[in-house]
Amino acid sequence: MQSSPDASDIEMLWTVATARILLGSEMNLQVPPNLSADNYEIYLEAGINDWGGVSPLTIDYVNPEAPWPQLADLQSRSASKGFELRPRLPIYPEFFTKSHVKKSEMLRTHIENLIDSDGYVKGGMSRYVATD
């Protein structure tokens, strides 16, 4: 893949939109925002619902040449398309809140201390981005 050309924006948008149609609204679709830094918010319109593991602390180890966007910018661009940026744990909220996975008592207690009633990180983006 290293010698393969990157997919164009049109190819990526088509792929995301097709995946959304085929996989349905319950499937989580990710597109890393750092791989199309100029216009990454367009993928929200195509059907993604997750930016993946964006980190303000680490580089993208898979694509170290592509820095993560600032969280405030990611939040602003998401909001511009009508979406609320919400931090989550590595486990998707529905897998915990709907009990799709078996959990030990210790793990369940630890996760419950970290999440809100919707299964997202308590405190939301205000834990990571200063708000006015």
Language-model-derived ranges and their functions:
Residues 1-132:
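Auxiliary Fe-S-binding modules of radical SAM enzymes
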